[in-house]
Amino acid sequence: MKKLVKVRGITLGEGRPKICVPLVGKNLAQLKEEAAYFQTLDADIAEWRADFYEDVDDVDQVCAALAEIRGLLKDTPLIFTFRSAAEGGEKEISTARYFSLNEAVVKTGLADVIDIELFNDEEQVKALVETAHGHEVSVIISNHDFEKTPAAEEIVSRLRKAQELGADLPKIAVMPETTADVLRLLEATCTMNEKYADRPIITMSMAGKGIISRLAGEVFGSAMTFGAAKKASAPGQIAAGELKEILHILHRNL
């Protein structure tokens, strides 16, 4: 029996994939506008992509902005993510700053979930997972390959590693060059979900070619999908409203 992940009334790992919409404002005014606009969307979860935020180097400013976002989102689940440039993010910070930023966010109690990148020092990842869980914050451990789609075995291996490190939600996003690459991601998702996962997983194939993977999570085993509000944070994201409509059609017929 797989465990479910429950965040503020949203349950990941049962029913249709839950829709997450990123907030990508560069400053507090833009973020507040996006958070207010989010309330008009038919989405389940918000993700603050703090790597877009111009004051991300100032932890106090980050925590203050987080408090503003939390207030506007009310009871919506909120993921805090600093995506490194190496994995498709807007900027790079040192490893030490990356971990201290995430730890500071965890200790505010304002984010429900943090996203930690898999390819970091294992002991530091484990320590941050432990700190997060101690503050009742769930953890995504993620990997993003914007260059290619690895072999199915490698995709499964990375997801299993994230699970072993304590992720509540192991995640991988890969870039397809061919249609066969998309099939490989779906095959790996199915294999992980049926053979190895004891918790919900999140997978996607990016760009236009991979769009089917954002829609078919309930069939193949991905518990969350990402939709766009006004500006996409990754290639291939479609509008949240359209996404929910398609997911409901699929859910009714499965």
Curated annotation (Swiss-Prot):
Keywords: Amino-acid biosynthesis, Aromatic amino acid biosynthesis, Lyase, Schiff base
Protein name: 3-dehydroquinate dehydratase
Gene Ontology MF terms in the entry: 3-dehydroquinate dehydratase activity
Active site (catalytic residues): H144 (proton donor/acceptor), K171 (schiff-base intermediate with substrate)
Assembly and binders: Homodimer.
Role played: Involved in the third step of the chorismate pathway, which leads to the biosynthesis of aromatic amino acids. Catalyzes the cis-dehydration of 3-dehydroquinate (DHQ) and introduces the first double bond of the aromatic ring to yield 3-dehydroshikimate.
Region forming the signal peptide: none
Annotated GO biological process: 3,4-dihydroxybenzoate biosynthetic process; amino acid biosynthetic process; aromatic amino acid family biosynthetic process; chorismate biosynthetic process
Family: Belongs to the type-I 3-dehydroquinase family.
UniProt: 3-dehydroquinate binding residues: E47, W48, R49, R83, R214, S233, Q237
Catalysed transformations (reactions): 3-dehydroquinate = 3-dehydroshikimate + H2O
Top-level EC class: lyase
SUPFAM superfamilies, per database record: Aldolase
Biological pathway: Metabolic intermediate biosynthesis; chorismate biosynthesis; chorismate from D-erythrose 4-phosphate and phosphoenolpyruvate: step 3/7
EC number, UniProt record: 4.2.1.10
Annotated organism of origin: Bacillus licheniformis (strain ATCC 14580 / DSM 13 / JCM 2505 / CCUG 7422 / NBRC 12200 / NCIMB 9375 / NCTC 10341 / NRRL NRS-1264 / Gibson 46)
